[in-house]
Amino acid sequence: MTRGNQRDLAREKNQKKLADQKKRQGASGQDGNAGLSMDARMNRDADVMRIKQEKAAAKKEAEAAAAAANAKKVAKVDPLKM
């Protein structure tokens, strides 16, 4: 007599249980935060966000410079449409 997929179902149930336990641990229990105080985590996260914002600002400036380079330098004005 075989039991079918009982082993697979038990494995899935155990993985779900472990994932729920990991969620409940909070920020200090996560792998990336192990051994760090709350202040250290906040400083690390602030540094990461600062770097991301600097990259975004540089990208925005580069796009603005490219748009300005492609823009027409002399605007044509039709005096009859003024």
Curated annotation (Swiss-Prot):
Stretches with biased composition (Basic and acidic residues): 1-23
Annotated function: Positive regulator of protein aggregation and age-related proteotoxicity. Induces conformational changes in aggregation-prone proteins, driving them into compact formations preceding the formation of aggregates.
GO BP terms, alphabetized: protein destabilization
Cellular component GO terms held in the UniProt record: cytosol; nucleus
Span list, region Disordered: 1-41, 63-82
Name this protein carries in UniProt: Modifier of protein aggregation 4
Disruption phenotype annotation: Suppresses protein aggregation and toxicity caused by protein aggregates.
Family designation: Belongs to the SERF family.
Keywords assigned by UniProt, alphabetized: Cytoplasm, Nucleus
Localization per Swiss-Prot or TrEMBL: Cytoplasm, Cytosol; Nucleus
Species this chain originates from: Caenorhabditis elegans
Stored Pfam families: SERF-like_N
InterPro entries, sorted: SERF-like_N (IPR007513)
Lineage: Eukaryota, Metazoa, Ecdysozoa, Nematoda, Chromadorea
The encoding gene: moag-4
